[in-house]
Amino acid sequence: MPVRIPDHLPAAGVLESENIFVMSETRAANQDIRPMKVLILNLMPNKIETETQLLRLLGNTPLQVDVDLLRIHDKESKHTSIDHMNTFYRDFEDVRHKNYDGLIITGAPLGQIDFEDVVYWDHIREIIDWSQEHVTSVLFLCWAAHAGLYHLYGLNRKILQQKRSGVFVHRRTCQHFPLLRGFDDEFFAPHSRFAEMDVEDIRQHPQLQVLAQSDEAGAYLVLSRNNRNLFVMGHPEYQKSTLNDEYHRDLAQGLNPNVPQNYYRNNDPEAEAIARWHSHGSLLVSNWLNYYVYQLTPYDLSDMTAMTPWESRQETLP
């Protein structure tokens, strides 16, 4: 089923060329289908690239998805035109009165800055707090996952001496969660960050559970026990070239970055990059949208109290 996006959004042409089913708002208005309403808070510098990556995953699910794009209202985007932002993005004041089936909060290039020192931290906290009452399920990616664990559960992160960049093997640590349905016992996922959360700190928290982790990259999938918040420590949305682009950007800035691990053939940055994570990245978002959004969200979004209790759904999910 299609992902519904604003007319003329630049990502549309890219996705259509990849045979991803997208639908304009005009066309979707003529269909009598209750789409899943998903809000995306895009904190990444290249807004259009990130939009395309996330819409690619949402467009590969069997559900019709109606997407709104959200920005921090007083933060200027240095890498995306103001015309694009004003045309396709909403401010929080435009949506705070609404309810959504899902919210995705992206990563951000803020890995070495204390959360409290992030200039728009108060806005992030406000949106996270709002989401707990107005959204069925929240998907936090990379930096946002760390920020969410810190704000909601009081867990802090450790700053790494070197950026963790590359594609790492992960293993399932739980066997019977719908989120992991169809996953192999081991799978790949990309990481690009300057910090990490301690796996044992997460395990010891009574409201959290670790569903997948890596010996090299640590915790990857963390789910709150009320099934409302999913924290993904990596970047399942990344396209094949993203780590390469980041590596060469850092080289150009004189940062002397490490070569992304397990990414280039024979770990040679002059060789071809190999994408090993796309199938599981797609499956992750599809399972989240199906089992943790679609099957739990109320038909009438104005009444979030009508959300189906998770316990009653487990009996029907083998």
From Swiss-Prot:
Listed GO CC annotations: cytoplasm
Describe the task this protein carries out: Transfers a succinyl group from succinyl-CoA to L-homoserine, forming succinyl-L-homoserine.
Q: Which HAMAP family match?
A: MetA_acyltransf
Q: Pinpoint the site Important for substrate specificity.
A: S192
Q: Where in the cell is it found?
A: Cytoplasm
Q: Which reaction does it catalyse?
A: L-homoserine + succinyl-CoA = O-succinyl-L-homoserine + CoA
What is the protein named?
A: Homoserine O-succinyltransferase
Molecular-function GO term, any one: homoserine O-acetyltransferase activity
The UniProt entry annotates the active site at: C142, H235, E237
Organism the protein comes from: Shewanella sp. (strain W3-18-1)
